[in-house]
């Protein structure tokens, strides 16, 4: 949890230090945004490939400070400054992938970026956050067989049981059924059917 702006600054600095160990640093880059810009450019130059930047739970600092308007404004400013160089990094970036529970347009962090797309409810991407029936049957067949054996079921009975217990998520109007990966992998690990999401 980000209880103060210093915690966010420390987390950003720690991540940048990790990347700078890999891609190098420039002492003239004295702000988070300049450091990020430099890291992206050096990663591109060293690899010869455009960078993919993944930001998981980008909205976590904002949500943690939801009940403190002053802190939230400070955190929003830090994040806006940190992400501000991304638009100008187009030649070095292949894409930016953000995950979070808040719409990025509501966070006022990415106002510099006018080409972001919310893909969370688009058919073409509806299966990226879970496991499809085909993936379950092809990639996890051995897990299903072990689950069936542990529960005295046939393979087909285990598939039905798994579908009833962990299937049914839809992320777009025409989405195929998606299995919850957290619950599914916990079921495989423990060899039992349970409501892992709620425990």
Segments (PLM) and residue ranges:
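Phosphate-binding site recognition
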Residues: 1-199
């Amino acid at each position: 949890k980000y209880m103060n702006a210093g915690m966010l600054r420390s987390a950003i600095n720690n991540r940048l230090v990790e990347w700078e160990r890999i891609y190098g640093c420039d002492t003239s880059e004295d702000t988070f945004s300049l450091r990020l810009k430099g890291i992206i450019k050096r990663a591109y130059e060293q690899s010869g490939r455009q960078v993919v930047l993944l930001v998981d739970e980008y909205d976590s600092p904002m949500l943690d400070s939801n009940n403190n308007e002053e802190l939230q404004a400070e955190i929003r400013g830090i994040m806006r400054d940190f992400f501000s160089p991304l638009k100008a990094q187009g030649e070095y970036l292949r894409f930016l992938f953000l995950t979070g529970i808040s719409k990025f347009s509501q966070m006022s962090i990415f106002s510099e970026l006018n080409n972001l797309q919310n893909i969370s409810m688009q058919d073409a991407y509806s299966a990226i956050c879970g496991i499809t029936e085909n993936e379950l049957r092809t990639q996890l067949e051995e897990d299903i067989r072990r689950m069936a054996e542990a529960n005295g079921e046939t393979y087909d009975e285990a598939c039905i049981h798994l579908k009833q217990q962990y299937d049914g998520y839809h992320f777009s109007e025409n989405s195929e059924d998606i299995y919850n990966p957290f619950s599914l992998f916990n079921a495989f690990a423990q060899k039992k059917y349970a409501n892992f999401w709620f425990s």
